[in-house]
A protein has these predicted regions:
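C-terminal catalytic core of tyrosine-transesterase DNA break-rejoin enzymes
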Residues: 159
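Conserved acidic, metal-coordinating active-site core of Asp-based
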Residues: 22-24, 28, 32-146, 150-155
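Short, well-ordered beta-strand core segments
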Residues: 162-164
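Alpha-helical substrate-recognition element adjacent to the catalytic core
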Residues: 1-20
């Protein structure tokens, strides 16, 4: 939910996760044996830094994971998303239940077999790319987008040339 101009460091757009939904999302995730995490300036913040899927997120992004007692109580800063991590066998069902429970409140997509992204409503890659193209005076016909996750489908469809990678 955040777009930063890499040249200037200026934040062009920031969509903050609704603070009133942090605890309900974390409670729901825990109920289904899924681990919520978010990020601060130092890396990942989670209730179980030893969770193998938390470790995978840390490895992918080359950042450390810090364990806290209670994630919702710990979050005292604006966040852009909560990432839910868990067993790939369970995640399609959990994603479906989350989409039902938080319909009209959050955007929810699986980005990998073991990751569910929960973001402010309307936040998705295609909307962000549309904003960037508009700022550049361009349209989707000028965009090539490649993606390899379920959360990439809207972006791939939006682009003039969309490529789904295996």
């Amino acid at each position: 939910g955040k777009i930063i101009d890499c040249k200037t460091g200026e934040t062009l757009v920031q969509h903050e996760f609704p603070p009133e939904l942090i605890d309900p999302v974390c409670t729901f995730a825990r109920y289904w044996n899924v681990m919520p995490l978010t990020y601060d300036a130092k890396g990942i913040v989670t209730e179980d830094a030893a969770n193998p899927y938390v470790g995978e997120e840390a490895r992918i992004n080359k950042i450390p994971a810090r364990q806290v007692e209670n994630l919702p109580a710990e979050i005292q800063w604006p966040i852009n998303k909560l990432l839910l991590v868990g067993d790939p066998v369970d995640m399609p069902h959990v994603e479906e239940l989350m989409q039902q429970k938080f319909a009209g409140k959050l955007s929810i997509y699986r980005s990998a077999p073991f990751f569910i992204e929960t973001m402010p409503l309307g936040v998705e890659k295609s909307a962000s790319l549309a904003l960037l193209l508009k700022n550049m005076g361009l349209g989707p016909e000028n965009l090539m987008a490649c993606g390899d996750g379920w959360n990439d489908l809207p972006m791939i469809r939006y682009a003039g040339m969309g490529v789904a990678m295996g």
